[in-house]
A protein has these predicted regions:
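Basic, polyanion-binding surface patches
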Residues: 2-178
Length: 178
């Protein structure tokens, strides 16, 4: 990188406001997952928009969670979690767990995954994991899970997508990704 470009980058770094950061990153679509776990007999869940594949060998996935998240420490203490990929017809489910109005589990059908974490068969897919590592990253933690089981629920639904503060779904292909 040329010195003038580097200087420009360093000068501009301090100009990034949380609002600008959120606006620009809001232009990037993300999937919506419901990361679940257990605390004794109590099912727990948190809505995640940062779920990502990390490694195929070993099979690792990850997500970011805010340092102020109240549910995550209870899920982490159990040593496992299940990432349920929400379908485009599950906006109400995402909102129920996001807003925490009433009991979000009421009317939500689930079965125990291999780890015991709640697996939601109405979702597009579920990825059951043991906690592999947790790294602090600014005001978030990056959670890495080792996949112990996974399930394509073959619901025929499309995954729920979040973009610019709104939910949507994945449209027809505009080209091959291969």
């Amino acid at each position: 990188m040329a010195a003038s470009q580097q200087d420009n980058h360093e000068t501009r770094k301090g100009d990034i406001t949380p609002e600008a950061y959120r606006q620009v990153l809001g232009r990037f679509p993300t999937g919506v997952t419901l990361v679940t776990g257990m605390d004794g007999d109590e099912p727990l869940a948190v809505v995640i928009g940062s779920f990502v594949s990390v490694s195929m060998e070993p099979s690792l996935v990850g997500f970011l969670i805010g340092a102020d998240a109240r549910t995550w420490p209870r899920i982490r203490a159990g040593g496992s979690f299940c990432a349920n990929v929400l379908a485009d017809d599950q906006v109400d489910l995402a909102n129920a767990f996001f807003t925490r109005d009433g009991d979000p589990w009421e009317g939500t059908s689930w079965v125990p995954a291999l780890s015991g974490s709640p697996m939601i068969p109405a979702c597009v897919a579920s990825i059951d994991c043991s906690v592999f590592d947790v790294m602090e990253a600014g005001d978030h933690s990056f959670v890495v899970g080792e996949v112990v089981d996974l399930k394509d629920h073959e619901t025929g639904g499309s995954p729920l997508v979040f973009l610019g503060g709104s939910y949507g779904s994945f449209g027809p292909s505009v080209g091959s990704g291969s």
